[in-house]
Amino acid sequence: SARSALFNWLFIKRFQGIFILRIEDTNAELAQPEYYQAITEPLEWLGLHWDEGPYYQSQRTEKYIEAVNSLVAKGRAYYCDCDREKIEKRNKDSGFQGGYDQHCRERNIPDGVGTTIRFKTPELGSVEINDLIRGQVTFKNSELEDFVIRRGDGTPVFLVANAVDDADMAITHVIRGEDLLNTTPKVILLWEALDYGTPPQYAHL
């Protein structure tokens, strides 16, 4: 949003950093000229000029797929052939209310058409986020499901793209809307599983 962009721009100017514009268009529906213009034109109108980019995630897919495959190879992710209907039916029958029920976690199914890849979220421990605005925020791993990192059509999700790009671009600070707070522990888990070292500092407006 323009609000988040403004806070990023002001932060960068205050601490003499680099303002990087990244277009998160891993979803094919968003990889359209009108979507790009809806991002860049308001920034230009506000005078929020970026130092690098724009970088389009849709043009960096190979990097993300490499990261996903490395997680599978390390046993940190697995193939899943469950569609939404199957998951909802099992949850209804069992009364499970935690989202995905880890049905395929130990099944060792092969890759195939329509098969997704899920991250194997640690069952113990927690993710601690020292949010620059909200202070210490804790997410228990037991409350985070095994989330999808590659869609059934073979494309990676933005969570993987963000982790890879943050590492590649040496991002030190991420300032964004509070609506993305619940995705942050997932990005941090991916960051750690990919052995990227210390993740960026986060601030959720």
Task: Give residue ranges: language-model regions.
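N-terminal Rossmann-like or analogous alpha/beta NTP/dinucleotide-binding catalytic cores
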Residues: S1-S94, D153, N182-P200
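Active-site cores that bind ATP or allylic diphosphates and position pyrophosphate for catalysis
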Residues: Q57, A73-K74, Y78-H204
